[in-house]
Amino acid sequence: MPKPGNLVEVTNPFISDDLGNTWLGVVVGESNVTLTVHFADDNAIHEYRKATINNPDSNGYIIMNVVS
């Protein structure tokens, strides 16, 4: 499990559903974890989104909607 502050690189985490929505799925392995997801595009526009996993039944899996 990565320690707080460590950079975690996820390869090809994007999932598309039947409706054509794009989602970002990350497995972190435990609950009560806050993730900061860094989005950067080719124009060097950076966006940071925070999401907290605090459901012990979630098995440490988070899915975020990706706005296109």
Where are these regions (language model features)?
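Short beta-strand-centered aromatic/proline hotspots
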Residues: 18-30
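Intrinsically disordered, low-complexity, charged/polar segments
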Residues: 40-68
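Intrinsic disorder/low-complexity segments enriched in polar/small residues
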Residues: 4, 10, 31, 48-51
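A generic structural signal for ordered secondary structure
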Residues: 7-12, 23-25, 39-42
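Short aromatic-glycine-enriched beta-strand elements
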Residues: 33-36
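Short coil-to-beta transition motif at edge beta-strands of beta-rich domains
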Residues: 1-17
